[in-house]
Amino acid sequence: PFDENDESLDHMRALHPKVKAWVAEHRQLQESRRAENRQRSRDFWGGSLRHISDLTARDRYRFRVTSTLFRAIEKQGGQIGEAKLTGKVTFLVSDQELKCVIAEKMSRATKIIEGAGKWTAFPHHHQTGLVSSGFLRVRFDTYVNGRSRDWIETSKKKMAIILPDIVSAIIAAG
């Protein structure tokens, strides 16, 4: 449902510094886990710890969308406050904080699907029993004008098309 090669989004080699830090942290965690497992394999009682997966296409897509959104907000005069790997972000616009979540749209699994958690390298960031819908969702956690805003990607409306509306709403909320 998504185009991993969408040219309107930031490339993985040119991500926003906050998003680039997430990728670097993930790689560093993978390397330290490999080193720890090598060390444990030499121990008599040593069992290995769970392997940390590579970033999936869905992870890379979410990172590219997030990076593009960050750059657009900064271009409009906003700032990026706190930005967590889970997708929780704080934007600072005109000295006003706006909390937002950029995450995978999840749906309840009606039956157990083999390999259902393989869509992300971060399965511990999501509730069990939920699976990816294949679309991203951007939600304001801060109420603006008495309501919360929500944008959900669909097969007809890709996130690259929705991003200008999101940027406008964030800047207008400040």
What is each PLM-predicted segment?
Residues P1-G174:
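Long, charge-dense low-complexity segments
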